[in-house]
């Protein structure tokens, strides 16, 4: 098998997982570059780096959001870690549809090309990632930029749908003998629920943006008021996907954090069944709250009361997860390895993001907060410190298993501390700006807001330095990393003293060779539970 053939036509879940990882890192660099330009423009009250070209500012906001969400976080958390480890954890030979797995990856590089092209062609897609009509209609954005952004969303949707079908079928049908659904590790449950969410929500998004595409190019009037359409319909279709999407991003992170905390406290996760039900509840409730993004469009009072209450209910299963992790930490033999540092950072910062979310769930308060930097601060605490920290924790936890090479612990710790400090310096001031009424998506602002904006922009520069240190850490690992090949990794210590189960199925990835062989199991494992 030649090198080109192996990587282009691969049907191995491990090779495809590594391709997703490389792709996600490239997309992350593109998206981070855009975010830095956004923050540099906001470092002063008047026109700064973009010379007053506000359209370019909004184009960067659109590109940053689409690249970060669809091309970075989802491909790595679901595509890379999910593909690589889910079959190993359930004792499967490979994914159920191995060739489908290949095409679901190769839908993504054209999506990145479309996003970059949409930024560079004509005036760009200055719509924000929500792509609301009438701003995204042909009258406001006449060039092909918005069409390209829609095509990028179509491609990522196809990729995610095919992947979701694959994950569901693999999980249900390809578990090894002795692994029942209830025994599956929390990361497998997380990917399973995420796949169900993708399967139910993505068709709605695809329908919504396809109608927009037809409005733009075929003179239909779905969102055109003069033709009897309604732009609010688009908001309902978009957010029926958009809210489950935030859980699609964070639920795999929950799974990773569970594994990391379990390993580095030498304890099984507190309340495993409760954790599974909590993930399922979060996923279900995520479909019932979409209009909390739309309190200011003129919903009647009953709708606002319902969506406020339903949104607050999501805090209950989320709280169960947070407190179960804390209960696992309590009395555990903590080892502050790098993945554990990121997991602890995740717990602290994700909780803060959740608390600001509870405030935003109130319809009456949200009227004041809507479209201010308070919202930007909230969702970046959840994404930039929830999803991102869990993603990096997953890389440092499983990276040695994927590549058979150890990372430099000093570099990794510097990466953690600098990132932890810098993301707080960026996003904490945004809450203060939002409370004072600074609107989102607007590059110029009154002088009164300059102080916190300067602080936030300096934090952005610091975060870029931390990202570069993280990349250098990966480079050192891959070029000069201490060899961990051919070792059979022993199971974590807590299993040896855990009488109920000598080797849990969740640790199959820890007891295979590092890196896992091209064919993980020469014969299928049988897991025997000792009771």
Curated annotation (Swiss-Prot):
Q: Which domain of life is it from?
A: Eukaryota
Position(s) of the covalent cross-link 1'-histidyl-3'-tyrosine (His-Tyr)? 243-247
Residues annotated to bind Ca(2+): 41, 46, 443
Q: Which UniProt keywords apply?
A: Calcium, Copper, Electron transport, Heme, Iron, Magnesium, Membrane, Metal-binding, Mitochondrion, Mitochondrion inner membrane, Respiratory chain, Translocase, Transmembrane, Transmembrane helix, Transport
Q: How is the cofactor bound?
A: Binds 2 heme A groups non-covalently per subunit. Binds a copper B center.
Q: Name one GO molecular function term.
A: metal ion binding
Which residues of the sequence carry a binding annotation for Mg(2+)? 370-371
Q: Name one GO cellular component term.
A: mitochondrial inner membrane
Which Gene3D superfamilies has this protein been placed in? Cytochrome c oxidase-like, subunit I domain
Top-level class of the enzyme under EC nomenclature = translocase
The entry's Cu cation-binding residues are 243, 292-293
For this protein, the parts annotated as crossing the membrane are 18-38, 59-79, 103-123, 149-169, 185-205, 237-257, 269-289, 312-332, 340-360, 385-405, 414-434, 458-478
Q: Assembly and interactions? A: Component of the cytochrome c oxidase (complex IV, CIV), a multisubunit enzyme composed of a catalytic core of 3 subunits and several supernumerary subunits. The complex exists as a monomer or a dimer and forms supercomplexes (SCs) in the inner mitochondrial membrane with ubiquinol-cytochrome c oxidoreductase (cytochrome b-c1 complex, complex III, CIII).
From the Swiss-Prot or TrEMBL record, give the protein name: Cytochrome c oxidase subunit 1
What species is given as this protein's source?
A: Candida albicans (strain SC5314 / ATCC MYA-2876)
Q: What is the lineage of its organism?
A: Eukaryota, Fungi, Dikarya, Ascomycota, Saccharomycotina
